[in-house]
């Protein structure tokens, strides 16, 4: 998976409430994405540039799905739910573009969250792999060098 992500879907560095847990079989139990802490009404952003593949309700929850540009065939596709979409199918989006807001539903997480998924074709992948280390791990922190002798 290429690290094409340029922003987190919500916030600056949201808490991961539930991580990636791939199922052993296609229909087996598991977690096909990650749940990120996000309050209702928070802006949801495209992590990378692409085209809106789908925006609308699925099983009573709003979903936005984006095909990511330049990620091969079939292209990588991110999904975000529950989201009140501000985009429509076919819209081109840039990395960081607002695609909707987090809806208030309590059916997936114990607290307010957004489920972020990643697929290539019908295969689910870990969406955190889209984020380069500098974004995934947070900013670099310089430490003082007091007491360190100069060369």
Task: Enumerate the language-model features and the residues they cover.
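Short hydrophobic beta/alpha edge segments that flank linear recognition/processing sites
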Residues: 63-66, 93-108, 116
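Envelope-exposed proteins and targeting segments
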Residues: 12, 30-32, 40, 48, ...
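Zn2+-dependent peptidoglycan hydrolase active-site motif and core
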Residues: 47-84
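Short, well-structured beta-strand-loop connectors
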Residues: 43-52, 86-102
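Acidic, glycine-rich catalytic/binding loops that coordinate metals and/or anionic ligands
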Residues: 2-11, 37, 88-94, 112-151
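Residue-level recognition of beta-strand microenvironments
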Residues: 19, 55-56, 102-105
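Short, acidic/hydrophobic/Gly-rich beta-strand patch recurrent on exposed beta strands
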Residues: 28, 34-37, 63-70, 117
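Short glycine/threonine/proline-enriched tight-turn/helix- or strand-capping micro-motif at secondary-structure
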Residues: 15-47
């Amino acid at each position: 998976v290429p690290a094409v992500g340029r922003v987190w879907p919500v916030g600056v560095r949201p808490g991961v409430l539930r991580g990636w847990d791939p199922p052993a079989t296609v229909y087996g139990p598991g977690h096909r994405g990650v749940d990120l802490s996000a309050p209702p009404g928070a802006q949801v952003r495209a992590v990378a540039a692409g085209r809106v593949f789908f925006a609308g309700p699925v099983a009573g929850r709003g979903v936005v799905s984006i095909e990511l540009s330049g990620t091969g065939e079939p292209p990588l596709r991110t999904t975000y739910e529950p989201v009140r979409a501000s985009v429509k199918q076919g819209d081109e989006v840039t990395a960081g573009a607002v695609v909707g807001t987090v809806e208030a539903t309590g059916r997936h997480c114990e607290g307010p969250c957004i489920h972020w998924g990643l697929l290539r074709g019908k295969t689910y992948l870990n969406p955190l792999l889209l984020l380069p280390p500098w974004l995934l791990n947070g900013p670099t922190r310089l430490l003082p060098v007091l007491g360190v002798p100069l060369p």
